[in-house]
């Protein structure tokens, strides 16, 4: 499974591309997760998820995060040209006007309906492949539902 995830990732992410992890990256052991991170292309930014603050993930994502990521946030506003995003692990019920809320956390929860201008970018909700920001924007604006695996 890990090989497939790495292949999917590297098929769309280039070495210089900026990529945002929106939390809950791994439940694996430190060494295993570090080995995976080392194989993933891109300039990595971390938005911390609820499972990144405890257990095995705590060391990797709270103490040693600078080995893998250029920065770490709980919440981040990002502007790319005309696209404006609020990034958080958790979906919001309300956010800044004109922005799209990209989130994870739900793990493609059955029956969850994103609000307009909101999209679950979690790997398990998107065929285990990262999305281009433009695609995430369009899916949020068009009210597309994430994949339902449950």
For the regions a language model picked out, list residue spans one by one.
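Conserved beta-sheet core of the metallophosphoesterase superfamily
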Residues: 62-149
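Core catalytic region of metal-dependent phosphoesterases/phosphodiesterases
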Residues: 1-74
């Amino acid at each position: 499974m890990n090989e497939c995830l790495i292949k999917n990732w590297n098929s769309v992410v280039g070495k210089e591309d900026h990529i945002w992890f929106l939390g809950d990256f791994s439940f694996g052991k430190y060494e295993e997760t570090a080995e995976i991170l080392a194989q993933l292309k891109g300039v990595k930014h971390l938005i911390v998820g609820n499972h990144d603050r405890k257990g095995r993930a705590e060391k990797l994502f709270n103490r040693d995060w600078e080995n893998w990521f250029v920065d770490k946030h709980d919440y981040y506003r990002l502007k790319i040209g005309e696209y404006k995003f609020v990034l958080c692990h958790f979906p919001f019920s309300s956010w800044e006007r004109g922005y799209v809320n990209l989130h994870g956390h739900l793990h493609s929860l059955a029956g969850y309906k994103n609000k307009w201008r909101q999209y679950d970018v979690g790997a398990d909700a998107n065929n285990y492949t990262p999305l281009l920001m433009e695609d995430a924007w369009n899916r949020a604006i068009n009210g597309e539902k994430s994949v339902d695996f449950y």
